[in-house]
Amino acid sequence: MGIKNLNTLIESNSLNGINKRHLSSFSGKILAIDTNVYLYKYLYGKSNHIDGMFFMINKFKKFNITPIFILDGKPPDEKTDTIKNRRLIKDRLEEKLSLLKIEIKALETDMEIQEIQKEIDVIEKKIIYVNRNVIDKTKTLFDLMGVVYIEADCEAEHYCSKLCNLDIVDGVVSEDMDTIACGSKLVIRNFTNRDDNVESYYLQDILYDLNLTNKSFIDLCILLGNDYNHR
């Protein structure tokens, strides 16, 4: 549910809650992976999602980390309006994309073609969607590489947090700050295949620095605004 400005607030007010750590420090740990976040990241990038996931899995193996990949399930009813708005925006962008692809065929100069192509490239990234084909290919890769994955009955970040709260996993790997709001005691962010260093968010240290209880922290996240509560 993307908490607005939460990361900025934590960075500004919690000296102990965020630490830069090398992945080797998580050797022997079990981590839940908010998979769809990284599928979108790899689809947006220059490499395809299979390449991205392949290198991600190998990096975990390199540092003796056991990943459990969690795939998105059905979003909650409270998110219906947000999903409808996103779909409307996507439909408008697809319509604009179709018109631009027609327009570019009629252009003559390289400069004009390059300008329109840039606009096309931007829109194509904005309408990227993790569809069933992407999920099926990713699951096939997981099977081939012998890693565990779960298709959640809810949004992946919530399921990851549940596993963390139940001490089934030691932490959550995600770029979404809502995993912290959901109570994950450890959230690992800024994971890339190019760098072995990550940022680790420790919920108890964050609460201590902010002088908040867990309930007060959740109330703060609601006030900041999210996919259910627009501010």
Where are these regions (language model features)?
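Non-catalytic, usually N-terminal nucleic-acid engagement modules in DNA/RNA processing proteins
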Residues: 1-100
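Extended two-metal-dependent nuclease catalytic cores across DNA- and RNA-processing enzymes
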Residues: 84-231
